Design a protein with these regions (language model features):
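N-terminal secretory signal peptides that target proteins for export/translocation
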Residues: 1-12
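Sec/Tat signal peptide C-region and signal peptidase I cleavage site
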Residues: 29-35
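Short, glycine-/small- and polar/acidic-enriched structural segments
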Residues: 36-185, 189-195, 206-217
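Pocket-lining segment of extracytoplasmic ligand-binding domains
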Residues: 98, 177-266
Length: 331
């Protein structure tokens, strides 16, 4: 399975390029009867990291194929993939935080399954920082405003009685490699990095000061889909969710079975696997469902940014009906 990163200049161009690439993939595949019987489904992930790991587990272990699904995994920024969900060009988006935010202001999308109820982020600092209070008046790098990195940073600073709007300067500068480079070069004083990204930062002499995932419950990783697509392709959605729930069951029960997946798909070194796996299990959702209260951060952020949006109850941003069906069929 090739994982393609999509980075064109505009939203429409990005979605168009996804479709063009997928058509090439389809054309290049063998035309035997087994391949023809599989139903293609497009899974958009925002990054090849732990948040999307259950998708890679299901793909690597052949669970999608066993359920009759040909999973096409593409990498698209979470803030632009919502258009693809609404139009049906993308079947699933793994950034459920973005799905919740879109649904919260009336977009016809829903979260169908959740993987984690917290992040794997760390506050990583320059080596001379020994206490978070030393970051008062300093800078912290996140990916973008309204992202999980943003929510985690603010929650961590509030926990230690620092006002993230006044006491520290939060800078949205982009992806993990950009944040690592900014921290190591001294352009920022700290950065929110996930448990894979922090490893090269530590090797460069930086310090993982604290695990920020412990201070905020929020949706991290899962599958969201368009309402219309879910109705039109209910059987394919059901099969996909069954594969995903089977992957969750395996991840919880057998770390040794998924270790090769982390090494091959997420580029996790063998010596780092146990620590990364343990971080994931701190916030793992084996049932695939999340408490509604844990959706508050993205939901309230979206509502605050769109005060004229129509009323949308928090409970309506998720739809676990198909997941609940498939859970009964997995032993």
């Amino acid at each position: 399975m090739q994982i393609r990163k999509i980075a064109p200049a505009s939203v429409c161009a990005r979605i168009a390029l996804v479709l063009a690439l997928l058509s090439l993939i389809f054309a290049a595949e063998p035309t035997n009867l087994a391949a023809q019987s599989l139903k293609p489904m497009v899974f958009a992930v925002s990054a090849t990291d732990v948040s999307a790991s259950p998708i890679f587990v299901a793909e690597h272990l052949g669970l999608f194929k066993e359920e009759g699904i040909d999973a096409k995994i593409v990498v698209i920024r979470s803030d632009i993939v919502m258009k693809g969900l609404v139009t049906g060009d993308v079947d699933f988006a793994s950034s459920v935080s973005s799905v919740v935010k879109a649904a919260a202001i009336g977009a016809p999308v829903r979260t169908l399954i959740n993987f984690f109820n917290g992040s794997f982020f760390y506050l990583v600092t320059k080596p001379d920082v020994s206490n978070i209070s030393q970051l008062k008046g300093k800078t912290v790098a996140i990916s973008r405003y309204g992202s999980a990195t943003d929510f985690d940073a603010r929650a961590a600073f509030r926990h230690f009685n620092l006002d993230p709007g006044k006491d520290v300067q939060i800078l949205a500068i982009g992806g993990g490699p950009t944040r690592i480079a900014a921290l190591v070069s001294g352009r920022v004083d700290s950065a929110i990095l996930n448990n894979i990204e922090k490893i090269p930062a530590e090797k460069a002499g930086m310090k993982s000061l604290l695990f920020t995932g412990q201070y905020l419950r929020q949706p991290v990783g899962g599958l969201g889909a368009g309402v219309q697509r879910t109705a039109e392709k209910r059987e394919e959605i059901r099969r996909s969710l069954r594969a995903m729930y089977r992957a969750l069951t395996i991840m919880k029960a057998d770390r040794n079975r998924i270790k090769p997946v982390f090494e091959k798909r997420l580029d996790v070194r063998a010596e780092n696997f146990d620590a990364i796996y343990d971080d994931a299990m701190r916030v793992f959702l084996p049932s695939g469902e999340i408490d509604l209260a844990d959706l508050a951060a993205p939901y309230e952020d979206a509502r605050s940014q769109a005060p004229t949006a129509p009323p949308v109850p928090l409970a309506s941003v998720v739809d676990y009906s198909i997941l609940q069906e498939v859970r009964k069929t997995v032993r």
